[in-house]
């Protein structure tokens, strides 16, 4: 008898598990492919396209390129999504901090690097700016019954036959590769969407209108595949519902453990008049970028095949012809203008049909939806009304019912809510929307300059050394603009922020406002201010301002010593030419223009040579020797030069031979500001013969000061980030050696890692230098009113002329007419970054942590400041006379002035040097009583920067 086996208890297994079905049509995401029950779509991210400051031919080329790519997608459905992503402030801060090589040490009591970087981030986050992101979904293939069955049993099939589970995607691989190549061409410039892109698109579509989460803005490399159960990460916690007949749909979701509610109004594009893009109108999808709130777009398009279009077009042409005959034959009337335009279009279409429908005249139809959100229904409706007003009168924007279904259209894979408001046209018409048109200028690792102020608002960061270190380009930069356009303000901003990040700067500012940078507490220990008109004799010796080449700078040459000797010879020749120009400029015009004058000067200069230990006095001595040898004119020239030598400012050319080079300091200063306050320069554009003796000397001193500025380039390590800033450079273009200086800086800026800023009122002065336009890298153009100057500025920007951009330069930095206060509005510039980006930007220095910098760079005169100083001085004198004490002016041993210099510089002798060119305030020498200390505190802060520094 057979024994029965004991019965085993059955395990629960997987049969009892509930099946999860997503609340959206999407069923899986695999790489950049999304799958629904009936369709597979490939998603791509479109590159931003520059539109501003392009010629009409360049814009038409872009439109035709996009149209040709759309024409290649015949027979396919497309889903276009335009969304926004908050500007990645933390990523910029990390890149900026990493790029700040050899930055300045922190100074006790001053703005530290961490505080500076935190302030930049907080200010940038407060501006709430975002990047526009454009995604395009392209239908790959429909799904068969077998494909849907394989997806349903994928968990089991993946264990039994893994290859069968992947068969659908492998079968589509060649078609996907073909689509990748089509959309990657110029025009769309699309790349397959990454996992981060897909995740962001899904969240922004499912949670339409909700604030962007900070956690997803830095979404790292995510999973390549999302199954149906994984899609719950996007849908759970987000709910859409609409009250009956409500004009908006409510979106409720969780954001950082808080419930957030938004009202979303979905609009649709209706009838559209003829738009003339690019001759008159801008791309119609770009209009929404001008609004001060985010706008979402969703467009569903079907690219029609030629055989589907031909019959329909012929029927439409027949209707138009019948209507024309009805007016002209039946009633003997002229047809309406709109009907006449349709008749012209009929002739064009008939020609297209007879020649065959090409890619550029392929037809399509589609639906364009717009979504705006608000905290409540009233705000959402108000924003929707702004969209309607923005597009009037040429484009009608409709506000349909069934907002819930229209809102779901934004989610990839969802079906159309309605076929109402279908728009038909050619691919050229659809391409003229240019959805990816945006403002693109600068980079994402440099200092923050401000923001774009065109149709698209974006932060503008710029690394002045990216061109030299990465892109192997020159570091030449032009800053052009009329009086009050903000050139000095922009220069000071660039110098300050890059100095904090580790650069070394030498600034020549003849008028002197940028010298205030050396008094800022965080910069003072590393800065020096030299007023050249009060400096040591010989600081502008023409033989010393030209740097002597160093052998280590030629280590990468094939024959370093030979290259070094060649450069030494060139430096000596430059010194001789510079001395010749300077001494000729010191002579009266009638004497200098005589041919014999140049001959005798050239002979004397050649005799003295070009060694760096020479000085112009030796040239005068040589002229006198030649006079004694019978050269009478040499004596005349020597007498004139000796007379000029007696002028106070001429002593800068003739060194005291008992001293060392006055330029060489005892420390490596990070910032050196050279000023020439009190120097009288000639009127710009005035001929040489009208210059006075003082003006002629001033031009030569300015030329020598510019050469002295560039000397720092060659005195330090060539790999260090260095910068030179030169103001009043329009005079350099009038002096031969000034042109040589500009050309030399342009050519050596890459090799020696230099950013050279040339500021001038007129672009023509810089264009006068041969090759400047081809060597310049970045350009800033401020407000310019003269028509000729505007055209020259556009040439410098490499922007097409004669197409209407000239007038825009006269509208920069507008000021309200009714405003009677000081014009402290942020200045605007046209910024060309040297790498193809050209945009109008607004310089931003409104951050609270930079308030002291804004005050230091404020060059606007203010009579109230002088009145405050005058009244404070009167009060000080009254206190001094009333005390009757003989030692009232004595400075206390532990008084504030005793600490001021110590906080700025570590050595006592350096404190004395910094105070040489400052006006001492008698108020600081008082032992101020307690009851008047508060009254005088403001004056002390304004007039004694060392006290403020402490």
Model-derived regions, located:
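An aromatic-glycine-centered, glycine-rich loop/turn in mixed alpha/beta architecture
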Residues: 1-27, 40, 57-68, 74-75, ...
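Surface-exposed, low-hydrophobicity interaction/linker segments
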Residues: 98-108, 273-360
């Amino acid at each position: 008898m057979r024994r029965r086996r004991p019965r085993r208890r059955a395990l629960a297994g997987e049969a009892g598990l509930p099946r999860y079905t997503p609340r959206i049509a999407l069923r899986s995401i695999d790489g950049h492919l999304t799958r629904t029950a009936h369709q597979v779509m490939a998603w791509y991210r479109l590159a931003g396209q520059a539109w501003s400051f392009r010629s009409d031919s360049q814009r038409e080329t872009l439109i035709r390129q996009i149209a040709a790519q759309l024409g290649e997608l015949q027979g396919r459905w497309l889903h276009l999504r335009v969304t926004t992503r908050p500007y990645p402030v933390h990523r910029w801060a990390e890149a900026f901090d990493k790029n700040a090589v050899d930055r300045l040490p922190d100074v006790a009591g001053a703005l530290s690097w961490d505080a500076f970087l935190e302030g930049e981030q907080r200010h940038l986050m407060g501006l709430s700016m975002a990047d526009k992101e454009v995604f395009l979904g392209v239908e790959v293939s429909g799904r068969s019954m077998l494909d849907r069955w394989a997806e349903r049993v994928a968990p089991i099939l993946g264990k039994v036959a893994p290859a069968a589970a992947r068969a659908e995607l492998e079968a589509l691989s060649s078609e996907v590769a073909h689509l990748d190549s089509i959309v990657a061409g110029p025009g769309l410039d699309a790349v397959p969407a990454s996992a981060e892109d897909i995740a962001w698109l899904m969240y922004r579509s499912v949670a339409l209108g909700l604030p962007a989460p900070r956690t997803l803005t830095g979404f790292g490399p995510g999973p390549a595949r999302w199954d149906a159960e994984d899609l719950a990460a996007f849908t759970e916690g987000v709910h859409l519902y609409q009250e009956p007949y409500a004009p908006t749909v409510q979106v409720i979701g969780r954001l950082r453990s808080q419930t957030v509610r938004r009202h979303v109004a979905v609009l649709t594009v209706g009838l559209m008049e003829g738009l003339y893009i690019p001759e008159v109108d801008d791309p119609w999808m770009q209009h929404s970028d001008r609004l001060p709130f985010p706008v979402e777009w969703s467009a569903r398009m079907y690219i029609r095949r030629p055989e589907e279009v031909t019959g329909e077009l012929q029927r439409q042409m027949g209707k138009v012809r019948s209507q024309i005959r009805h007016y002209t034959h039946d009633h003997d009337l002229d047809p309406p203008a709109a009907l006449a335009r349709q008749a012209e279009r009929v002739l064009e279409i008939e020609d297209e049909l007879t020649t065959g429908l090409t890619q550029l005249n392929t037809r399509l139809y589609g639906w364009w939806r717009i979504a705006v959100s608000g905290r409540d229904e009233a705000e959402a409706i108000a924003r929707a009304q702004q969209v309607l007003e923005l597009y009037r009168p040429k484009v009608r924007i409709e506000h349909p019912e069934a907002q819930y279904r229209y809102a779901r259209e934004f989610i990839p894979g969802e079906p159309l809510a309605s076929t109402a408001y279908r728009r038909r046209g050619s691919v050229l018409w659809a391409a003229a929307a240019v959805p990816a048109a945006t403002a693109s200028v600068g980079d994402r690792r440099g200092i923050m300059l401000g923001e774009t102020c065109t149709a698209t608002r974006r932060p503008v960061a710029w690394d002045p050394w990216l061109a030299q270190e990465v892109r192997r380009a020159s570091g030449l930069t032009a800053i052009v603009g009329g009086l009050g356009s903000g050139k000095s303000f922009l220069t000071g901003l660039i110098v300050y922020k890059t100095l904090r990040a580790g650069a070394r700067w030498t600034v020549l500012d003849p008028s002197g406002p940028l010298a205030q940078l050396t008094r800022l507490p965080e910069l003072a220990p590393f800065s020096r201010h030299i007023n050249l008109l009060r400096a040591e004799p010989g600081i502008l010796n023409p033989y010393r301002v030209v740097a002597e080449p160093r052998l280590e700078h030629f280590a990468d040459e094939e024959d370093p010593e030979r290259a070094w000797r060649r450069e030494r010879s060139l430096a000596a020749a430059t010194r001789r030419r510079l001395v010749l120009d300077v001494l000729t400029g010191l002579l009266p015009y009638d004497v200098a223009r005589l041919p014999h004058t140049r001959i005798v000067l050239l002979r004397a200069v050649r005799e003295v040579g070009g060694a760096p230990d020479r000085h112009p006095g030796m040239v005068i001595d040589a002229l006198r020797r030649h006079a004694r040898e019978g050269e009478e004119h040499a004596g005349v020239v020597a007498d004139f030069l000796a007379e000029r030598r007696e002028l106070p400012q001429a002593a800068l050319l003739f060194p005291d031979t008992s001293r060392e080079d006055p330029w060489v300091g005892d420390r490596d200063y990070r910032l050196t500001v050279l000023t020439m306050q009190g120097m009288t320069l000639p009127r710009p554009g005035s001929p040489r013969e009208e210059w006075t003796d003082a003006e002629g000397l001033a031009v030569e001193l300015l030329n020598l000061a510019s050469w002295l500025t560039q000397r720092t380039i060659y005195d330090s390590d060539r790999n260090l980030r260095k910068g030179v800033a030169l103001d009043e450079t329009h005079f350099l273009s009038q002096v031969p050696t000034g042109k040589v200086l500009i050309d030399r800086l342009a050519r050596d800026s890459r090799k020696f890692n230099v950013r050279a800023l040339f500021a001038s009122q007129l672009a023509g002065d810089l264009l006068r230098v041969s090759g400047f336009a081809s060597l310049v890298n970045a350009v800033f153009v401020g407000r310019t009113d003269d028509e000729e100057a505007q055209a020259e500025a556009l040439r410098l920007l490499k922007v097409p002329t004669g197409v209407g951009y000239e007038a825009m330069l006269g509208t920069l930095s507008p000021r309200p007419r009714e405003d009677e206060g000081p014009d402290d509005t942020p200045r605007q510039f046209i910024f060309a970054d040297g790498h193809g980006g050209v945009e109008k930007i607004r310089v931003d220095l409104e951050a609270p942590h930079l308030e002291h910098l804004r005050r230091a760079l404020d060059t606007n005169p203010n009579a109230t400041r002088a009145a405050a100083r005058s009244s404070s001085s009167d009060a000080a004198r009254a206190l001094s006379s009333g005390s009757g004490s003989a030692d009232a002016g004595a400075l206390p041993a532990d008084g504030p002035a005793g600490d001021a210099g110590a906080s700025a510089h570590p050595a006592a002798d350096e404190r004395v040097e910094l105070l040489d060119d400052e006006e001492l305030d008698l108020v600081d020498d008082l032992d101020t009583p307690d009851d008047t200390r508060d009254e005088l505190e403001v004056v002390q802060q304004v007039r004694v920067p060392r006290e403020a520094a402490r």
